């Protein structure tokens, strides 16, 4: 083990630098990322999320260091520290930083104030018969089938969305129940990959709000055994989660503006931006005109932007992912 002298003339282990390196890194990210936006509520939220992310990313490292502290032999302790240091996942720390920077960009775009929308029940329709959505996001009962295709035209997934007659109450607000099932392959006979229940509400201006979801995603090992995850589930009013607007009744007034579609920090942070209201697209062999074009993103996946197109009287007809994958409504 190398031993050096500090400025007091006392000996210290150079390994100490490596032990505290993750903490120095976290502090460095906090200082660097907050220079542009002083101490606004939005910036403080970004810092809190960064701290949570880095804490998770360095948890195994610090537990390893704690175990090393209980080794009496210096060389064994040093070897233990080296092993713990090499177990540190730098990619996870990089992701934490990228998410932090993405949240800061959102703060610059939305302003530094807190996200605290008024979703009191008196601002929303309370009669199920009135819960019909708007022209670009209908909430009338019905079934929509989408096919997800790669750039070669191969069908990767089949998505079945059902707007149900059922309603429920979330945070005191009447919501329409919508189910969303994702199947592997070209039909509903493939493996179920995702099973989601969404909740949508409508305010007195006709804007459609997203009040949360409960979702189960399935992954499969080589033997075909499934593993289920509920990651991404959230509900407005629970654990400080808040709803957002999924579609404005007059999207023309929102062109170019960023807006939150949901907010459960670290779980659900989708945002939308209206790009235009007169797009023309072809999906499922049908040409649609006068479409609202939005771009959706989330700080949880920095740099990933989805282009979505909504046509009057129908709703969502096309989603285009960054890799060119197209999710098309099938008539």
Residue ranges of model-derived segments:
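Compositionally biased, intrinsically disordered low-complexity segments enriched
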Residues: 12-14, 37, 256, 263
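Residues at the start of alpha-helices and the adjacent loop-to-helix junctions
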Residues: 28-30, 45, 72, 307
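Conserved functional acidic sites
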Residues: 82, 94-331
């Amino acid at each position: 083990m190398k031993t050096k002298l500090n400025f007091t003339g006392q000996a210290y282990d150079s390994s100490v630098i490596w032990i505290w390196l993750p903490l120095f890194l976290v502090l460095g990210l906090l200082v660097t990322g907050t220079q542009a936006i002083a101490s606004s509520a939005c910036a403080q939220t970004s810092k809190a999320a960064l701290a949570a992310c880095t804490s998770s990313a360095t948890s195994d490292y610090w537990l390893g260091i704690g175990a090393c502290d209980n080794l009496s032999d210096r060389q064994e302790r040093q070897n233990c520290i080296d092993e713990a240091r090499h177990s540190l996942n730098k990619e996870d720390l990089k992701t934490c930083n990228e998410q932090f920077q993405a949240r800061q960009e959102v703060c610059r775009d939305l302003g530094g104030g807190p996200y605290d929308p008024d979703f009191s029940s008196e601002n929303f329709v309370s009669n199920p018969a009135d819960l019909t959505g708007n022209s670009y996001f209908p909430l009338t009962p019905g079934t929509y089938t989408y096919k997800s295709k790669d750039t070669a035209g191969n069908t990767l997934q089949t998505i079945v969305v059902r707007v149900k007659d059922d309603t429920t109450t979330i945070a005191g607000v009447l919501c329409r129940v919508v189910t969303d099932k994702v199947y592997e392959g070209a039909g509903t006979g493939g493996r179920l990959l995702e099973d989601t229940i969404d909740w949508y509400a409508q305010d007195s201006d006709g804007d459609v709000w997203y009040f949360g979801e409960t979702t189960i995603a399935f992954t499969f090992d080589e033997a075909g055994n499934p593993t289920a995850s509920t990651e991404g589930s959230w509900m407005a009013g629970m654990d400080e989660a808040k709803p957002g607007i999924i579609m404005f009744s007059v999207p023309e007034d929102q062109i170019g503006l960023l807006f939150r579609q949901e907010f459960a920090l670290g779980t659900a942070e989708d945002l939308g931006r209206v790009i235009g209201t007169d797009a023309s697209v072809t999906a499922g062999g049908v040409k649609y005109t006068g479409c609202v074009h939005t771009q959706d993103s989330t700080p949880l996946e920095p740099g990933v932007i989805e282009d979505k197109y909504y046509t009057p009287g129908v709703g969502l007809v096309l989603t285009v992912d960054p890799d060119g994958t197209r999710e098309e409504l099938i008539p």
